[in-house]
Regions:
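Short, low-complexity N-terminal leaders and the immediately following helix N-cap/first helix
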Residues: 1-88
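Flexible, glycine/charged-enriched surface loops at secondary-structure junctions
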Residues: 55-56, 81-86, 144-147, 204-208, ...
């Protein structure tokens, strides 16, 4: 790469895209990498502020920004995603399906700490749709040493930075608990909320029963729901420390492994998550899920539908960003709620 005066560059080959920005109108390349500069191009180049310009000179120790962007893309890519066209030295990764985006934060930080290169991603554990942008990659200068890119590649030698886990068509069960519903003192308004949220993922409810505050009956119901083919079991209500609330005990008595009873998220502190020996999640949902627009359930549900096991450590990490502000206009998931680590 060689720097020379634009007015002297006729016949030379551009080594990078030249961008023109007109506020509110366009931000795009007026000339692409590889373009041979003509006399007529000089006024255009000067009008976009290019009094001096880089032209291409072969150097086997260096990589052009487009080549480097391809390497960065390769370090990120995984199944169910594809690249955009390279543009102005940048490649973006696009989702091929609906699913859960996972980001290896340690690898991402290591690569971005090397300098002269960058990878920007969406938040990990984010629900994305087919066609959504997942990440963007580029180097900062126009050229970069091959050796430096090889160092970056070594960071990802045991796996890429991104994973996109497709959602699965789940069959789920709802066990409505509480004397107040069982004895028809109040209407069950919880189950429709669960159905609506699961419908977003194409899931089908195959089992629904209502129980009084009897732990043994709820335990038996969980087992029968799984025998009926439920991939996910949701127990609604009965999650507080009141003496009549038996759901946590009932879930424990199924023999399932309790991951966490309680989560640093509001709304949703009394949330319970357990897994059976064969990996079926049993979830205890507190009453806030019924009346609050967004809760802990919205943070965990996409992971359950994608068969992405949730750990106690991950739930503990939700504390920073775990406070929903109940905004008048809800923009979730495009907000800070649930973005803790």
């Amino acid at each position: 790469m060689k720097l020379m005066k634009t007015e002297d560059a006729v016949g030379q080959v551009l080594c990078h895209d030249i961008t023109q920005i007109i506020k509110g109108v366009t931000k795009d390349a007026v000339f692409r990498k590889g373009h041979i500069i003509t006399e007529e191009d000089i006024p255009v180049l000067l009008s976009v502020g290019k009094d001096n310009i880089y032209i291409w000179e072969k150097d086997d120790t260096m990589l052009h920004e487009n080549e480097a962007a391809q390497i960065l893309y390769d370090m990120c890519k995984n199944d169910h995603m594809h690249p955009s066209d390279v543009k102005e030295g940048k490649i973006e990764l696009i989702a091929d399906c609906d699913g859960l985006l996972k980001v290896d934060c340690e690898k991402l930080k290591k690569v971005n700490s090397l300098g002269e290169m960058m990878i920007a991603t969406r938040h990990g554990d984010t629900y994305v749709k087919k066609g959504d942008k997942l990440a963007g990659t580029r180097i900062i200068p126009l050229v970069i040493k091959k050796e430096k890119m090889e160092t970056a590649q070594a960071v990802c030698s045991y796996g890429p930075i991104l994973t996109l886990k497709p959602f699965h068509k789940k069959k789920f069960a709802v066990l409505t608990t509480g004397n107040e519903v069982y004895y028809h003192r109040i209407e069950d308004t919880f189950t429709p909320v669960i159905q609506e949220k699961l419908a977003e993922f194409g899931a089908e409810m195959i089992f629904h029963e209502v129980y009084d505050d009897d732990a043994s009956k709820i335990t038996d119901g969980c087992r029968r729901a799984m025998e009926a083919g439920a991939d996910l079991v949701f127990c609604t209500g009965g999650m507080s420390v009141d003496p009549d609330d038996k759901t946590p005990l009932a879930i424990k008595n199924t023999g399932a492994r309790i991951v966490s009873y309680g989560a640093p998220v509001l709304p949703g502190a009394m949330f319970l998550l357990a897994y059976t020996e064969n990996g079926t999640p049993i979830v205890g949902l507190p009453g806030c899920v019924m009346y609050s627009k967004r809760t802990i359930f919205d943070l965990v549900l996409p992971r359950l539908v994608a068969d992405d096991e949730v750990t106690a450590e991950e739930l503990a990490g939700l504390g920073e960003g775990g406070l929903c502000l109940n905004c008048k206009v809800c923009t979730f998931p495009n907000c800070g709620f649930g973005k803790g680590r």
